[in-house]
Each structure stands twice: as C-alpha cells, then as structure tokens.
C-alpha cells in the first residue's frame, strides 16, 4: 500500500531521481524558465519553492541548506542576492507551470514550461521603463554621412586567369 508515500518515482532509482530534480532546479534558477514534461515540472516545483523560501530567510544556515541541493556556490549566491529579494513580500507560489499545446515528438509526452513567476513579470515591467528612460538620439544631417564605399569586384579564378592569359598571348 502507498499510504503517505509522496512524490513520483519516474522509473528511476532514488539517487537518479534526486540528481535529476537537483539538476532541473539548477537549470530553472539559472535560466528563469525551462521546458520539461508536465510531471517533472510539478515535481520540480516541490524542490524549487522551498529553495526560494530559504533565500528569503537569508542566513548562513539557509545558505548551507540551499547548497546541499544546488551544490554550486555561485548559484547559491545568485539565489540569495538576486532571486530571494524579488520574492520578499510573496508568501508562496514562486513558480508558474504553463502547459504546452504540442506534446514531445517521439513519445508524445505532455510538455510544459516552468518559470519563476516574478522574474518574468518584473522583466516585462522593466522593459517599458527602460525604453522610456533611454534618450532619443538626434538624426545627423545628410552632409555628415560617410561616403559610399566602392562595390567589391570578384577575383577571377585560376582557370579563368589562364584562359585570359592565353587569349592575350595569341
């Protein structure tokens, strides 16, 4: 009986399953969003959301716990310095799973995109602000334009050069 056994097995050994989920978590935190199967995305959410909660705590013990999963000091630093503060006032739900219309070619597995919810919203909100803040460059007068470069001509091939030399000799 499967009483109080949570989590999916994925037809893998426990060590393989743990390594797969940790690698998916690393990829998600590095890239912000990844494409995987729906079931892996749902399991990945169970790994990533506690990591972001640890990043909101921002103490030494939380960093060590995050390092146990990520096994990369640079990624732990990024998690605590960049990703954690973005979700500071959010009580949970740090990831979003978007189901894709097309299944995976080959085995017809249902695919999904899992992404960090705030990172895509903040990037979308900052893009118009950055566009407004960028100064508009003034157009240069036509007199200051650079002169047009002469068109490049093609060099004759060795066979054509021999044929032309033979014509000149005759």
Curated annotation (Swiss-Prot):
Residues 124-170 are annotated as: Disordered. GO terms for biological process: translation. PROSITE patterns: RIBOSOMAL_L17. InterPro entries: Ribosomal_bL17, Ribosomal_bL17_CS, Ribosomal_bL17_sf. Residues 124-134 have a biased composition (Low complexity). Gene3D superfamilies: Ribosomal protein L17. Residues 135-148, 156-170 have a biased composition (Basic and acidic residues). Keywords: Ribonucleoprotein, Ribosomal protein. One of its GO terms (molecular function) is structural constituent of ribosome. One of its GO terms (cellular component) is cytosolic large ribosomal subunit. Pfam families: Ribosomal_L17. Part of the 50S ribosomal subunit. Contacts protein L32. PANTHER family: LARGE RIBOSOMAL SUBUNIT PROTEIN BL17M, RIBOSOMAL PROTEIN L17. HAMAP family: Ribosomal_bL17. Belongs to the bacterial ribosomal protein bL17 family. This is Large ribosomal subunit protein bL17. The lineage of its organism: Bacteria, Pseudomonadati, Thermodesulfobacteriota, Desulfovibrionia, Desulfovibrionales. The gene is rplQ.
